[in-house]
């Protein structure tokens, strides 16, 4: 797919494009980080085109990016991905416009009524990513309203604390969202929040994880009785699990998460991508 700035800016920032604007932030999230790590000037220049477009898309009310409404509610999931892109860019560049943009955007989020906040399936499942970005900004600016927003995000995000009745069994959501209670623990200080993330992780492996490589049998969704080696996990699930493991390690200091990340990275992920990284499998199964 052509992601050149001349085509992409028109499709993604001026119009909704093929899939809202989720696709570009997903790509940029990895591309930008690679650019900064490799210090590749051409990649950094291309990354900045998209970063500049995001910053310049800020609206008077604090919202940024294309407006994609569902039932009168603004969809927030794609913005969560773009926030991580902006955070990486700030850590590389120190560009304070990122802090201004995120501060204004989070102030806007605080004005949205609870009954119109995190209502869509994806954003409701994955509100923990938004919460993590709020912490990131708070640790730089220390603005107290961010903690109020953190509480609002937690109470409106799907409940990942109930191991007997998960909000959904989508493999990527499980890999990405099980850490939300532990993320909230950083504010609440309630050990029950921290332990909930451990319990969900172990529950899924106990029921669906009798496969090598650190993941679990799910295909698209984990289903009871479908637990043999013919069931697999999406490549997206591998990536989000590794990200969650890294974040859990950062929050807890528990080497268990480093070991689990290594298990997925070296035993599952390589089989999901071509050697040149130009193609990938949607689902990878042990057998």
Question: What would you call each of these model-derived segments?
Answer:
Residues 20-36, 74-90, 123-139, 170-186, ...:
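Well-ordered alpha-helical segments within folded domains of soluble proteins
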Residues 194-195, 205-287:
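Extended polysaccharide-engagement surfaces of secreted carbohydrate-active enzymes
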Residues 23, 65-71, 75-78, 121-130, ...:
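Short, solvent-exposed turn/loop segments enriched in Gly/Ser/Thr/Pro and often Arg
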Residues 55-63, 97-98, 141-148, 192-193, ...:
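Proline-centered turn/helix-capping motifs that create local helix->coil transitions or kinks
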Residues 140-148, 152, 166-183, 187-195, ...:
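Extended ligand-binding clefts on enzyme/binding-domain cores
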Residues 2-9, 13:
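Single conserved hydrophobic/aromatic residue that forms the stacking wall/gate
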Residues 14-17, 35-154, 160-163:
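Extended ligand-binding groove/face enriched in aromatic
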